[in-house]
Amino acid sequence: MNNIRALLDSIQSGVQTVSPEKHQQTIAAINKFQDDPALLDTILPRCVPLLTKSFFCMSQRDQKLVAELFYNLDKISHSKVLKSLDTSIFRLNEILNYLQDRASPSSFSDVLCVYLNLSWLSVILLSPYAFKDKFNKTLQVSSRFENYPICIPPINKIKAVLYFKNFTDAFDQLPEREQANVPFLNQFLKLFIQSSEKANYYFSNENLRHLQQVALSNDGIKLLPKLFQISFNHGSHDILDAIVEFFHDHLSSNSTDTRFQLAHSFAKIAKFLHQADPASFIELIDYTIENTVSLLQAPCDSIDSNELHTSLLIIAEVALAKILPIDLVDRVLTLIIPKTCHFQKSHFQIIKGHHIRDSTNFIIWSVIRSNRSNSLSPQVLQSLLSHLLINAFFDPELIIRYSSFAALQELLGRSNKSLALNQNDIALILQANWKDLPRSFEENSGLIRRLFNPENTSKSAVCVWKVFRDWSFNWNLLENLHLTTMKLNIDYNLVPLIKSKLSSPALLQEVLNKAGSSVTQNCQILYLYLKLFENDVNCPKISEICIDIYQKKIKFQLTTQAKRQFNDNSPELFQIFVILKYWQLTGQNDFNQELFWKFVDIVSPQKKLNLYNEFIPIIQQIISQCVSLNYTRIVQLIKSDNELTCRSICHMPDQEKMCSLFFSQFPLLSPQSRSLLIGELDHHWDVRISLLPSNSYRKFRNIIINCLDDYTITQQGDVGRLVRIQALKLMQSHPDFLSGDCDSINPKLTRLLAEPVPEIRKLSYQLLASATSQITVLSDSSILNFRHKQGLSEEFWKGYAVSAGAIHFTDSQLTSSIDSFIVYYRSLSPSQQLELCHDLIRIIPSAKQIAESRIRDRNKDPLTGGMRFDTIKFTIHCVKFWTRIMESGLVVLHPNFNFQGVFAKFYNLHLLDCTTLRVSVIKFFPFLAISCYHTMRENADQKNLSNIILKRLLVLVKREYAATKSKFMTDQNVALQGMFQIFLELGVTRQLQALQVACQKHELANILESDITL
């Protein structure tokens, strides 16, 4: 409540003092009340007048702010906002003049200003005056804004009121286009509901037939209640019959919106008849209920769920209107609700019916809200409690759990006198977690067993327990199409219930006598027995039944294609799951192995399913207990990157074959499969891998170490990072991995520590740092400081160059890397700065190294199959790193820095046939020239390197220019920009002007070296 009060205070403050600073905060506070507008209604009579009273005296900016606040309040509580507006007719001229003088809106804020004034105008026109003198002007100014959809509703209200007050003779006086305008007619006819006598002479029979034609369409449904009332008073029975017939003909509409409109309009007609003709009302509602009961007699698959949905919505709307007789309420709750509360049907393996269950909850909620529940028998209320508890906790759809819980709250709040539940028990129910379905089953199954078990003899508890048991053992076990829920029910309801002291021998016998009528149902029963067997319930007897069902009743036909995608409720996938579970638990080592591998092939692509993770241990255990594995088939599946087979390599019973298979197939796998397999190695390292003969163990260890160098790139990006991450996790899980030969591992960890992937940085740091020097926030600066204490190495700078010279990066990542480096660099002594610069040049591959890497197939590691870091790509990272640090202000270097040697190295790089590298180097040349010029300020050779670079850039410009006949290419553009950059940075005007003139006159081919050198 304190939070609500604070929000209301915030809104009132924002409305009282409208300002840009508070504006968004006020709107956010208003929108917090979307789910419960009644709380906001309390302050609207004060807020709305405050907003509008000085509207016409405000600046345009403030008018827009006010209009936006008004619009947001209006969205939450439209009718209450309109009722709170000032109705003084003295405001009329101000509003009309504002709308008349208003230019066409150019922004949404402008439209909202118009909307506010049109809404205000529609309220003032309800005053008891005809406004004849304002009639034409009002229609004229309002019609200017008919092209803005948001303005249409208030404009229709304005026109309806004006026509109603001024065209008083006959309907034919209305403009012809308005006679078929449904939104306008809806507002217009609404005015006649309060003036039935006027309607009797205003509408002729012809007029009513015309309105009938307009209303009897999907667009005109909202007109039907008003037309029905006018026609009833007019005595036009043929129109009344046509309207009722229209409802009956359209109950099965495919449109959900149409079904809701039909139900809402039908309820309004019923409400009118309840007052005007009670006998007809009873007949109409009784027919609707009987028709619904009749619908539910058919099998679910043959029921028209659209018609059923509309019928349920109608019943709910009528119940909410508090006009449904108690005997009919009782019929609905006893004959309809028990059948619709779990309604579902399958359509092309998609389970439908949640809209039926939702409308069922709507009925229950409406009955309780209408206070009809006070007249219901305790037995009916107990039945409702049972259904709502089950649906709120265990329905597969979250939206149904929401609506069930809302109805359950109402029931417990309004009818507990009859239910007689303990207040502590109510608190436990209302505090239960039901949003996550598996967790809800896990926690709330136990809650129901505790609160409503047979030891609790209250009538409510007895009823809930009976319904809960029937739902668990009968409907959910054999009729539920949602196999995920069925499985959760077995895991968390049936097995614990049978195992607990609450069960009796008769209950277990009831379970043992279950029989299915299809392969899927037999699999469901078999799964229950397997879970009982797994939990040591009557093992010998259950084991016999499992074998009997499997051998006699599971006639599995493999019809599916391996690549087909299932959903969690696919019967065929569940059948496969149960058969595999049977093989696992019964220890069948002579199972149908060919069928098993087909199952593995089918299941492996289903990684997105919740059930997938349960397949993994089952398949692994079956493989581990098989005495004669088909290794040829295994190799085929591994080569096709079958994930489940890859995950199972470590579970193969033959140790020698397991090693042979791993070493031969690991390099052939995709990075994703390699990372999964390393994860499996992690789980088996201590119990299996570390116990292998030393040669095999060493090879496994070397593979993991080499995986730290996996930089495989695909269309999905750096997928090698998955392998690097998993290898680091394995090392972290087994501290003794790092004991011994650390010389080969630490340099790799040092490089990875500086790389851009946060998880790789964190894991590398944790492996390198001692427990006492752990850093909470792992930033670029903290990494630099940590490595400085440890001693910086070239491997570290290779990793840092990859981060700071990244081709793809976020602004924050790049800024952090470069800024942290510059701060670190400036903290060093001059000699350390020089050494660091030399290190950063040394790590750049030479042109010769790049050429050699292209000739030899050295990029793929034969041990792991991973791609080593691409030499050219790494070189580009290094060049970009140098460019960025100089671009960010690191211009003056140590005077002993070998600028000429650096230029020679970069010169050779830009000669290579690699466009991206060449362009990167050409972009760096001007930075190198500028840095050398400023660093060697006191040196006689200050200008030498700058001139060499300028000459080279000129050669590139001329060569490209000559080759393309004045068409600018990438290299030429970059080289030209570089020359301009040097001239501007060094402040030389003669050379700058010469280059500008050559560009303007297209005479770049004629420019001389003497024109551009310093």
Curated annotation (Swiss-Prot):
Gene that produces this protein: CIN1
Protein's name in the database: Chromosome instability protein 1
Extra remark: Present with 704 molecules/cell in log phase SD medium.
Entries under PANTHER family matching the protein: BETA-TUBULIN COFACTOR D, TUBULIN-SPECIFIC CHAPERONE D
Molecular function GO labels: beta-tubulin binding; GTPase activator activity
Its job: Required for microtubule stability. Interacts with CIN4.
Any single GO BP term: protein folding
